[in-house]
Amino acid sequence: MNRKVGPVLEYSRRFSRVLCALRDEIRDPLQYGYQRVNTAEGSLSTSTTATSLDTIVLDTNAEDLASVPPRTLQHHQPQRTFSPILETDDTNPFLEPVEKAKSKSSLKSSRVSFDQEDDRFDEDENSFRKQREHFQKHKSHSTSEHKSQLIKELRHLLATDNRRQFQGKKHVSLDVKSAKVLEQLLKASSSSDDFEGQRKEFQERKHKSLDARHISFKFDKEPSPSSSDEDFEPSTSLLRIDADITKPVIIDLKDLDSSDEEDYISSRKHFQQSKSMSTDSRKSIRFLEMEMGTKEENMRTAVPFVRQITEEGKPKLEVYRPTTNPIYIWTQVLAALSVSLGSMVVGFSSAYTSPALVSMKDRNITSFEVTDQSGSWVGGIMPLAGLAGGILGGPMIEYLGRKNTILATATPFIISWLLIGCATHVAMVLVGRALSGLCVGIASLSLPVYLGETVQPEVRGTLGLLPTAFGNIGILLCFVAGKYLDWSGLAFLGAALPIPFLLLMFLIPETPRWYVSRNREDRARKALQWLRGRKADVEPELKGISKSHQDAERHASSSAMLDLLNKANLKPLLISLGLMFFQQLSGINAVIFYTVQIFQSAGSTIDEKLCTIIVGVVNFIATFIATVLIDRLGRKILLYISDVAMIITLMTLGTFFYMKNNGDDVSEIGWLPLAAFVVFVVGFSLGFGPIPWLMMGEILPGKIRGSAASVATAFNWSCTFVVTKTFADITASIGNHGAFWMFGSICIVGLLFVIVYVPETQGKSLEDIERKMMGRVRRMSSVANIKPLSFNM
């Protein structure tokens, strides 16, 4: 009975204490909280590790607490060290007070010192110690077995790394000793295929000794389980070199020590010297120097093949090759020659009025009357129609293509010359000249665009000047034929010139960039393959063209005119317009159109028709000189030379005519006009004649190239019309000397324009030029032209 009543009394006592505590807390919560804090501070253990209130520690006996009534317990609360608050459902027994020393000895590493003895802690501690000792023993046994394997793997990695470093350094040391063999092979080879075969056979023999599969590793010495990295001492040389250098190199891993650097370096040098001495006559490398304008870059065309083992176990070859294709010149020359024949027709048309007007005004030859006013229109209507042709040509090259636009001018050229040759009235001559001028405007726009998009940057300057050179051939042909033919026969000769041009245009492809703009990449690839050669890898260039087109599409607007007025596009357009302006305002077309009349007014002692022929020959020769120099000196240097030469000669001509008009005797210097004209034409043909047309196809962005070239061409022919139509009026008002001084002053301004605004485009791809002009350029060094190509054998 007492056993059953005891727990009930115990629970009732606990419940009464809880109620008392709650009552005190409700009456004065703040005071009760302070009391609890004070009692807690007093009850903390004096142990150095007891620093928190996480554990409740009792210093009194539970029996004493049980014998005290609840109210007495309340009054004596501050004298107690601490009184725990027990929940009603707490079934835990009261903790018996224990000695603090026992708690400290068993929980020295604990953060809080418990004043309670618990055998389970000692048991857990003993169990933990036993398990830890067992684990350490097990670990020592297991790691001793794996340690040897780990050391073996580490040494294997070290040997592999040292071998690869050694091979790489060995190849570098042998590079400079390898030029003679390939030269001998090249001289002894009958063809490029023969040379390639001998070179590959030589390289295969050469690299047998370098193949990673010929290197064996020896693991015959196993380290003891208790050994460490410090126990290994090198006893022999790192490398054992056989007498036959082509035999595999044995790297003995049992003798390998990463700290033995001196022994390794000595062995490597000895091996390198022996290898290079024994294979001096067989090792080869050839460096070809490729000249790109004024930049000379050494391009690697053959290097040692350093074999490395890939994860699949196959040897990996890494070679360095130029990223640009070798220049396959013949197809590009054919393309440039085909379109340049059209430029010859343009030159013939431009020079026609100079010899033809003299015979056309002769009533003994001509059945209709040609007045001075109608004669000026015969000379001036062609550039005016060229203005319309330039405007019309822009949409044509975008929708019909570059090639088809050029091809479309051949038949109208023939019709225009037949109209002039069969003319019975001056109106027929004017209609023929207008139709001819329309074709001239379209052709002068599309020819540089076609060549700029098909020719490689390395030869774009030279081949890009072929249209100008053939244009000067047309001028020379017109001057020479004009000495023997009248205006009608000269027109029939002009009708025959477009025939070879028409036939050759069927042989060349459309430009790859136009195909890409029309999403016809297969046709673009075929056209690029035709231009670069059958063996050329055209994929990188095709990807560059596609990327440039995509960039242009992202930055394009819905309106073509808005594209032209875009700030990024406006800069190259204004540069092109400026070059066209200073080209025509130099007075070149006034000189070409009225060469005979100028020499007649100068009173030169030399026959005026012979003078025109001399000027035409010099013009032709100077243009071919420019084709040689343009990729060596660059565009801007030739523009400087051209402008300075024109300034000097125009001022000299102005001074000569000024002296003549003032009545001074100039008979002793009658040769001066011809000499000045020759130097003027040479200067113009070197720079300001061909380069504005060439740079129009280079600096204009691809997205607006058609419309912008149309505007530039129309502007050029507008300036031509103004100069040729008003030249007679200008000379009548201010004299010949005033006209030439005016042209010379404009050339001075043109020189400043070139210095400040015109960029250099020599040796740059159209994509690089466009990124620079659009402000999206990323400068690359010449090393960017060489990149590693990896492939498996």
UniProtKB/Swiss-Prot annotation:
Residues 99-148, 213-235 are annotated as: Disordered. Residues 348-376, 433-434, 482-488, 594-609, 658-668, 725-737 are extracellular. Keywords: Cell membrane, Glycoprotein, Membrane, Sugar transport, Transmembrane, Transmembrane helix, Transport. InterPro entries: MFS_dom, MFS_ERD6/Tret1-like, MFS_sugar_transport-like, MFS_trans_sf, MFS_Trehalose_Transporter, Sugar/inositol_transpt, Sugar_transporter_CS. It is a multi-pass membrane protein. Residues 115-125 have a biased composition (Acidic residues). The chain crosses the membrane at residues 327-347, 377-397, 412-432, 435-455, 461-481, 489-509, 573-593, 610-630, 637-657, 669-689, 704-724, 738-758. This is Facilitated trehalose transporter Tret1. The keyword Transport applies. GO terms for molecular function: sugar transmembrane transporter activity; transmembrane transporter activity; trehalose transmembrane transporter activity. One of its GO terms (cellular component) is plasma membrane. It comes from Anopheles gambiae. Residues 213-223 have a biased composition (Basic and acidic residues). Glycans are attached at N364. GO terms for biological process: transmembrane transport; trehalose transport. Residues 104-113 have a biased composition (Low complexity). Residues 1-326, 398-411, 456-460, 510-572, 631-636, 690-703, 759-793 are cytoplasmic. Belongs to the major facilitator superfamily. Sugar transporter (TC 2.A.1.1) family. Trehalose transporter subfamily. It is found in: Cell membrane. It comes from the Eukaryota. High-capacity facilitative transporter for trehalose. Does not transport maltose, sucrose or lactose. Mediates the bidirectional transfer of trehalose. Responsible for the transport of trehalose synthesized in the fat body and the incorporation of trehalose into other tissues that require a carbon source, thereby regulating trehalose levels in the hemolymph. Pfam families: Sugar_tr.
